Amino acid sequence: MDDPDCDSTWEEESEEDGEDGQADDTTDEDTGDDDGDAEEARPSLFQSRMTGYRNWRAMQDMQRYRHNYPDLTDQDCNGDMCNLSFYKNEICFQPNGALIEDILQNWKDNYDLLEENHSYIQWLFPLREPGVNWHAKPLTLKEVEAFKSSKEVRERLVRAYELMLGFYGFHLEDRGTGAVCRAQNFQPRFHNLNSHSHNNLRITRILKSLGELGLEHYQAPLVRFFLEETLVQHKLPSVRQSALDYFLFAVRCRHQRRELVYFAWEHFKPRREFVWGPRDKLRRFKPQTIPQPLTGPGQADKDEGSRDPSQEAGTQGRTCGSGRDLSGDSGTAEDPSLLNTKPSDGGTLDGNQRDEAKSLSPKESKKRKLEGNRQEQVPGEADPQGVSEVEKIALNLEECALSPISQEPREAEPPCPVARVANEVRKRRKVEEGAEGDGVVSNTQMQASALPPTPSECPEAQKDGNGPEDSNSQVGAEDSKSQVGPEDPNSQVGLEDPNSQVGPEDPNSQVGPEDPNSQVGPEDPNSQVGPEDPNSQVVGPEQAASKSPVEDPDSDTMGTSVDESEELARIEASAEPPKP
């Protein structure tokens, strides 16, 4: 470095401030570095001033500030403390100013006014040295003590700091630590900061005033933020030189300043041109409490931690805090779908299954089985069955479960096949009587009515029975010995018994008109098929003279016998006929 007496950053702890440069010179001579490296680390005064790598004037200015202006003495101002009165909201800043509360409340988003007005900054952040605004009085030591002891004044000072951070596109993340991050509108504000270089002087004043008025812990986070935005993110190229010459050395804490210089040396390109610290000491330096960047406003954790600065270079919303690890959210909501995979839940589930196995419904049992299987599932694996599928399976199980208590009463069973045959015989006879008019029943119709029901009409053999309109359907083809009535064995109607068939094949089964005894009229009450239906008589009295074929009385299988009629009447009374 060109003048070691102007930088006490790397002096030994036991040395005095006036002997700062001797340690650097001695150490550099003792080290075995090459001559080229030594020349790069300590360029000549002429080279520094010509190339601008290290500003000698900035070194003197910051050294003077860090040592509390040893050449200054407080002037007698007759007890006037203008800076304190301004912060107590008693006077307006000069010239043509306003009260501090008016500035803090109404100037917050008025970026044009904050940019164009050059008189308020000396009042908001006073220093012990005079500035360009001669109306602003230098800060006195009495005022410094009053600033530190007044809670109201310190609160307004923090609000003024937040006002200027917002103007530059920053956000104060934590008032306690001074952590800084990007604001939501940082892009246009960064553009304004790159376009107006006079803001670099304002930032230097802000850093100095924070150190004077008791907010030294705000210095290092802000400087770290600028170093990262200039050297790592390259978003503020116009601020880079001021950050290295002024901002970096405004930090009064020597240890924090060393950490910041080391961070700047790590990210400076090309490193051989870095002249803001001795290279040999930077190589041996081990950072311990480098301020850590934050992720952004509203997205930072408040726990302390340590991270490697090189790993944080690529993060987007950068902030600076002192030894803070705010890389993520403090809490993460657990996935509701994984709540059932905990071991404690699994043990409770097994106990409930053993205790309540008998009282569970099929739906609940299926749900618990699926939950048990889900416990064995890999956390990263997708659930094979969703909630909707589980509900469907449970509903299907409920429908298939046979429980006499929970099931509703079923509909009435279909009538017996024998009763259905008798009912069909009655209906066919009524239709035939109305259609022919003479009451003659053909042999084929008699045969069809006497045939047993087909398997399609039996509900035990087949569910969907045919309607009574099919006159050719046979009932009981599989059982040739189906009985019409269990009491009368002679009433069996089957295909195996040729005598039971009534058709043209058996001439004896046909009864002609020559046999008057074959007439079945109302005089014989036993010949009625059903007592409820008087129209079910086979032949009326007016048809006695007609030549209608009547069954031979010798045939023991005719349905008009007394036993058969009684049996049919009994069956019909027990079973309701279906609606037509």
Curated annotation (Swiss-Prot):
Task: Give the UniProt subcellular location, in the record's own words.
Answer: Cytoplasm, Perinuclear region; Nucleus
Q: Cytoplasm: present as a keyword of the record?
A: yes
Q: Where, per the database record, does this protein carry N-acetylmethionine?
A: M1
What is the tissue localization of expression for this protein? Highly expressed in 6-day old cerebellum and brain. Lower expressed in adult cerebellum. The protein is detected in germinal cells of the cerebellum, in neurons of the deep cerebellar nuclei and in the glia in the medullary layer.
Q: Any idea which GO molecular function terms this record carries?
A: opioid growth factor receptor activity
Provide the positions where the record notes the PTM Phosphoserine.
S327, S361, S365, S403, S548, S555
Q: What is this protein called?
A: Opioid growth factor receptor
Species for this entry: Rattus norvegicus
